[in-house]
Amino acid sequence: MLSPKRTRFRKQHRGRMKGKSCRGNRICFGRYALQALEPAWITARQIEAGRRAITRYARRGGKIWVRIFPDKPVTLRPTETRMGSGKGSPEYWVAVVKPGRILYEMGGVSETVARAAISIAASKMPIRSQFIRLEI
């Protein structure tokens, strides 16, 4: 599972997901991509599930690029704990995704294979997304 090797601070504020993604919204490496249409936190488990789905479908052919990285810790308090006594401990990591952000890229395969593989990965994501291809 993806997570940072080290961070400056153990815990982070939740923050807000305003506006569109101004970075990471163009295809850079492959020919086909999965683009987010909604804002969300995508967990490291969901990213890994999508990556595995694409890899399994594409088998040996092609190359896959994961364009998001979970760098935000999400804290949870233990169940049946009273309020107070500080913030909970970090439980898992999420990537903050805004609309327009590229999640996965694919290259070296035909469009039909890429479309099918990316649609399987899209079903593993908690948001609506679209298949896009590099216009040359």
Curated annotation (Swiss-Prot):
Subunit structure: Part of the 50S ribosomal subunit.
InterPro entries: Ribosomal_uL16, Ribosomal_uL16_bact-type, Ribosomal_uL16_CS, Ribosomal_uL16_dom, Ribosomal_uL16_sf
Pfam families listed in its UniProt record: Ribosomal_L16
GO cellular component: a single term: chloroplast
Gene that specifies this protein: rpl16
Localization (cell): Plastid, Chloroplast
Matches recorded under SUPFAM superfamilies: Ribosomal protein L16p/L10e (SSF54686)
Gene Ontology biological process terms in this record: mitochondrial translation
Similarity annotation: Belongs to the universal ribosomal protein uL16 family.
Cited NCBIfam families: rplP_bact
UniProt-recorded Gene Ontology molecular function terms: rRNA binding; structural constituent of ribosome
Identification of the protein by name: Large ribosomal subunit protein uL16c
Keyword annotations of the record: Chloroplast, Plastid, Ribonucleoprotein, Ribosomal protein
Taxonomic source organism: Agrostis stolonifera
KW Cytoplasm (keyword) present: no
PANTHER family: 50S/60S RIBOSOMAL PROTEIN L16, LARGE RIBOSOMAL SUBUNIT PROTEIN UL16M
Region (Disordered): 1-20
Record-linked Gene3D superfamilies: Ribosomal protein L10e/L16 (3.90.1170.10)
Keyword Ribonucleoprotein appears in the UniProt entry: yes
